[in-house]
Amino acid sequence: MRVNYIKKGVLLLKIFNMKKIITLFLISLIVSCKSDPVLFELTTSVNPVGYGIVSPNKGTVWLGDQIELSAEANTGYSFVKWSGDLNDSISKVSLIFDSDKSVIAEFTEMTKVPDNIFEKYLIEIGVDDKIDGFVNTNKIKKITSLNISNKGVNDLTGIEDFITLKVLIADNNLISNLDLNFNTELEILSLNNNSLKILDFTNNTNLKIIYLNDNSFENLDLSLISNLIEFSAINNLMNCIKINNSQISSSSNWFKDAQTVFDTSC
């Protein structure tokens, strides 16, 4: 009987030790799992596509790690903000990882404005914030009227992106070249006392009023502007201004130099 008790005791001891070993193993396994490093994924994108780059643009990052994320705009564009799992308006930011991150770099198109005086005027009317040769294209697309007279402007480059512009008044400046082909909504144009020689009105068929006094025009073609009401181009170098047949009667009330004629076949 005593032997049996001893055997049972040894067996119970073995079972107890085995349970203890298993318990310790499980505890060790849990601790080990908790202490293993955790990896997270970084994914980035650019909106609109092609407007800029993000660095780094993707990667695997350990829990708690911090990376420096940078957004750089391509020429003609500007960084606006981060969106997605990051909300910030600074192009270079630090990002600490506690989960997977999907980040979007938002950019906007910029319009080149090389004339500092013109850009200063855009700052004055609230569509720009600093003189750097560029203005936010989305902001100027909404402008319907500009009066930039008596400023000493040489160059109106950038005006092509004012696509809803209806009124442009730029008298008494130093403008010698001007492209209005993209300003198809123009109705009133006043460019008195500049240095202009040529203007193409092919795409400005909505014009109703044109003032071009005191320039250096050698010819003009108004024949596509069917709704023109007022016109004046005194003190220029023109011999002939082209009009269409429907404008003949109206042209009698328009102003020109004595040597200049309105004709359908200039």
Predicted features along the sequence, with ranges:
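N-terminal capping/linker segments that flank leucine-rich repeat
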Residues: 35-40, 106-167, 224-226, 237-266
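C-terminal motif of bacterial Sec signal peptides marking the signal peptidase cleavage site
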Residues: 29-32
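Conserved hydrophobic beta-strand positions in leucine-rich repeat
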Residues: 144-148, 168-170, 187-191, 210-212, ...
